[in-house]
Amino acid sequence: LQTITDRFSKIGSEPVLEKRDIIEDTKNTVEYLQTRVSQQVSFSFKAPQHPIYVEFNPALHSWTIENLVKNAIDAMKGKGALNINITELENFVKIRITDTGKGIPKNQFSKVFEPGFTTKKRGWGLGLSLTKRIVQEYHKGKIKVEHSEIGKGTTMQMSFKKTTIV
């Protein structure tokens, strides 16, 4: 309950950003979620073996990862494979979350981030719009549907500018 309160208190206000290792924070969130998900979902986590520093708010970053993972699990109807892959470029880091779910039609790639858009029977369609707001407005990153194929799955991609520790 405290985590939820912390997250929502940061939305709408200017969150405090910290220079942190995005790999460690992402991995910790994924490991936490893995313990709370059906054994029918297999997780794969791949990342460089060294820290990559980005300016972000840890509670909000964790929430974006959690939302993307939960959406992926919903799309797979609770069973399938979930791959989280972090790659480093010269100035950026990319986080890709790939599922083996139902896929998203190409004409809905941008719509999935609109408030109120949902394909689920439950929910308000706010998760991805809040995720986009956190990634783009607060963390100055980018988020998109990188690839999706109906009946095969989807890859969501976030990218963030790297920073140096001073």
Model-found features: residue ranges?
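Glycine-rich ATP-binding loops of the HATPase_c
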Residues: 139-147
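Short conserved segment of the HATPase_c
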Residues: 104-116
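Detector for a conserved hydrophobic position within an alpha-helical segment of the HATPase_c
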Residues: 135-136
